[in-house]
Curated annotation (Swiss-Prot):
Pfam family, one: SCO1-SenC
Family affiliation: Belongs to the SCO1/2 family.
Entry-linked InterPro entries: SCO1/SenC, Thioredoxin-like_sf
Protein name: SCO2-like protein RP031
Domain of life according to the entry: Bacteria
Organism, as annotated: Rickettsia prowazekii (strain Madrid E)
Cystines in this chain: none
Length: 191
């Protein structure tokens, strides 16, 4: 039994290292290219350039132009999900490692439940994880539209009578966004 736990721990470490290596590789690769070379060699389509306007945790407007000039990681979730909390902790661990290598990323958490996750709720939630993370909320239809752009699958919010809590099932990916607002890649954060 203990041996299985050790094996699972080692597997999780290897997965985390692979994710970090992939992010570092993509950052170094894309940052070394000039804009013209990027257009010539990239197989990314302009349709993957995201556009949105939402509200950040301070109550101010935040749109896709705020991503320009920064390599960003975007994660979709809810503030009341233990699983999302763990996923953001993994992202935070990756960010700490990258900071030691002088690779700076902007992290954006976008709620899938804007009716619950208001700016104030996001602010309190992200202060507990990392106050540098940006939390975004907005109108339900704006969140739905953005989730469709990212191909995020999620269900309607349901109340679980067993746990006396809300639940919202969703896909669990973090998206790497270029400094010009294009989706470069996505990474599964595991279960």
């Amino acid at each position: 039994m203990r041996n299985n736990k050790n094996q699972m721990y080692i597997i999780k470490i290897f997965i985390a290292i692979a994710m970090i290596t992939g992010i570092i590789f993509l950052y170094l690769f894309y940052s070394s290219l000039t804009t013209s070379k990027l257009k010539e060699t990239s197989n990314m389509d302009d349709s993957l350039k995201i556009k949105f306007t939402l509200i950040e945790q301070q109550g101010k407007k935040f749109d896709s132009t705020n991503l320009q000039g920064y390599l960003s990681l975007i994660y979709f979730g809810t503030t009341y999900s233990l699983y999302d909390n763990q996923a953001l902790k993994r992202v935070e661990d990756i960010i700490k490692i990258l900071k030691r290598e002088n690779i700076l990323l902007q992290v954006v958490f976008i709620t899938l439940d804007p009716e619950h996750d208001t700016s104030e709720v996001l602010k309190k939630y992200l202060e507990k994880i990392d106050s540098n993370f940006i939390g975004l909320t907005g109108r339900v239809q704006d969140i739905e539209q953005l989730a469709q752009q990212f191909k995020v699958f999620y269900t309607s919010k349901i109340f679980d009578v067993k746990t006396n809590e809300y639940a919202l099932q969703h896909s669990n990916f973090v998206y790497l966004i270029s400094s010009d607002g294009k989706i470069l890649s996505h990474y599964y954060l595991g279960s």
